[in-house]
Amino acid sequence: MPRQVPIEKLRNIGIVAHIDAGKTTTTERILFYTGKTYKIGEVHEGAATMDWMEQEKERGITITSATTAAYWKGYQLNIIDTPGHVDFGVEVVRSMKALDGIVFVFASVEGVQPQSEANWRWADRFGVPRIAFVNKMDRVGANFFGVYEDMKKKLGTNPVPIQVPIGAEDNFKGVVDLFNMKAIIWEGDELGAKFEEKEIPAELIDLAQEWREKMIEAIVETDESLMEKYFAGEEIPAEDLKKALRKATIERKLVPMLCGTAFKNKGIQPMLDAVIDFLPSPVDVPPVKGANPNTGEEEARHASDDEPFCALAFKVMADPYAGQLTYFRVYSGSVKAGQTVYVSNKGKKERIGRILRMHANQREEISEVYAGDIAAAVGVDATTGDTLCDEKAPIVLEKMEFPEPVIAMAIEPKTKSDQEKLSQVLNKFMKEDPTFKVSVDPETNQTLIHGMGELHLEIIIDRMKREHKLEVNVGKPQVAYKETIKKKATAEGKFIRQSGGRGQYGHVWIDIEPNQEKEYEFVDKIVGGVIPKEFIPAVDEGIREAMNQGVVAGYPVINVKATLFDGSFHEVDSSEIAFKIAGSMAFRDAMKKADPVLLEPIMHVEVDTPEEYMGDVMGDLNRRRGRILGMEKRGNTVTIKAEVPLAEMFGYATDLRSITQGRATFVMTFERYEEVPRHIAEQVAGQRSKANA
């Protein structure tokens, strides 16, 4: 199948915003006006096309990025709708890799809200050009110019209004296009499909003139030849201004600003024009870079059908009909259905069964996909972040970095017979979502699920019930403590049992000492056969078993060296089990004498916060037994680096949200284990013995 749309006419865009700024409604309108849907879906009715998971329809929020292709004036738009809730930030990060441009949707009343700020920073990190759409202009308190000031102040960016609103609140009728100085008016309720160009209302001429001047000044500052014309007093044609604004937008010097009300069907078509006019095609962005797995050398792939095939799997989903769907962005070359590709970061081959072009949860089968495009593959065993490429020209693209899960809770099936099913379902969710992790607590043997927040885990539990008919019980969050020793100690372990018939006899002497290099080391110093060779591994096994449960609070023991140096045996009664028990007894006794302590995980925490909340955030980290390591200022944002015990970090996402009105974000990674202060260790031991009583 030959290429349907030239690569220059492709636009891979994300629609990003804070929760409730009207992003999904905006996407619905785009699909309606581009002819992809015949009936407009309303989010508050649970009918939106892009919100296709059951939980999304109920909650009215977008959880997974649905992707869809739409067509406008001969251009193909691949649109990714992303969630605005902080617990699902991973979806935004994940889709940034596949995008070339973003439409940031801001609510006209609230302006720049927390998650938009966080997502703006991610877009900065990934270097994605963007335009701004101020939505909900029909609401009471709508203030387009207020959002303009907000963007400058909170995002430290350079917004350029290319429209001004006509009216506001109930009287919002349309916009003035500042390039050709015409009013665009939506009259009547033709679902917004019809609009007229008129002369600018008399009362708005001065305002429009003032903002047109500001727009021209901002644009010519980025282009020397236009600046010369401007200062010479020449009239600059609208086309030249647009061309210069396109270049400045792609270079991330300026952000074109538009407005409308998606719900009332006004302002969407000019915004689609702006996507085409100002956001980049795959050819306009820098080539993607990666490493050749054979040589380790850096290589680049340009957006061209003639280069070797290279793509990134940016999302994996289980589909009720097709099995696993792997969404991928093609950076170079092309791939056909039925072709075998190389998953270079895993060194394995995969056959692409079918290729689908997605429209929310509907699909169209295509035979080939080319450079710059986005599609979904059926039958490929891949995970998020995998590189798919041509085996003859291998490349591994930069790994996707995801924030670490910050909350964990115990989970078990309501019926024992569902244990196997639970394991399968958890594995499936881990494949789909890189921020969802599963572990087993060796102490309690409980399965723990880890995620980005309570809503994240709630939705996973809900999906188990709905999609897999799996009922589970969940517990409260918990910390994985460990124990160790601070000094050397010696102890004897003697196990003798005489009870008719053959007895049991095992006798050992051991030294234990702190060992920072290894979690556990066993040294055999037996000489002269005082303990026969065949019983020595049993002593080691007995010590290991005893280390599963320390003497402070019953947590696993780490960083210990044990030396077996003496003992005795009985010709008839000695056995492996007797020496294993003797080893365990000796270890427990030695540990009590070796100054045992409780250890807790210390986390490295980085908080990105607007400057005005810096003092409150630092005060809060100090109250959590945190140590502040330093601070870094970036624009209006401060990054605070600290080390904080994990035990103090439960509920932090929620607390940080309330301290900073949700405008701060944080990333937490494990640093090391450290001794717990004595008074806290006593509390932990007390709670542990109560729980196990």
Curated annotation (Swiss-Prot):
Annotated GO MF terms: GTP binding; GTPase activity; translation elongation factor activity
Keyword Phosphoprotein attributed: no
Coiled-coil segments: none
Pfam families, per database record: EFG_C (PF00679), EFG_III (PF14492), EFG_IV (PF03764), GTP_EFTU (PF00009), GTP_EFTU_D2 (PF03144)
Recorded superkingdom: Bacteria
NCBIfam families: EF-G (TIGR00484), PRK12740.1-3 (NF009379), PRK12740.1-5 (NF009381), PRK13351.1-1 (NF009891), small_GTP (TIGR00231)
Keywords (A to Z) from UniProt: Cytoplasm, Elongation factor, GTP-binding, Nucleotide-binding, Protein biosynthesis
Encoding gene, per UniProt annotation: fusA
Family: Belongs to the TRAFAC class translation factor GTPase superfamily. Classic translation factor GTPase family. EF-G/EF-2 subfamily.
One annotated Gene Ontology cellular component of this protein: cytoplasm
Any GO BP: ribosome disassembly
PROSITE patterns, A to Z: G_TR_1, G_TR_2
Main localisation: cytoplasm
Cell compartment(s), UniProt: Cytoplasm
Name of the featured protein: Elongation factor G
Chain residues that bind GTP: 17-24, 81-85, 135-138
Domain tr-type G: residue ranges: 8-283
Entry function: Catalyzes the GTP-dependent ribosomal translocation step during translation elongation. During this step, the ribosome changes from the pre-translocational (PRE) to the post-translocational (POST) state as the newly formed A-site-bound peptidyl-tRNA and P-site-bound deacylated tRNA move to the P and E sites, respectively. Catalyzes the coordinated movement of the two tRNA molecules, the mRNA and conformational changes in the ribosome.
SMART domains: EFG_C, EFG_IV
InterPro entries xrefs: EFG_II, EFG_III, EFG_III/V, EFG_IV, EFG_V, EFG_V-like, EFTu-like_2, G_TR_CS
Taxonomic classification: Bacteria, Pseudomonadati, Aquificota, Aquificia, Aquificales
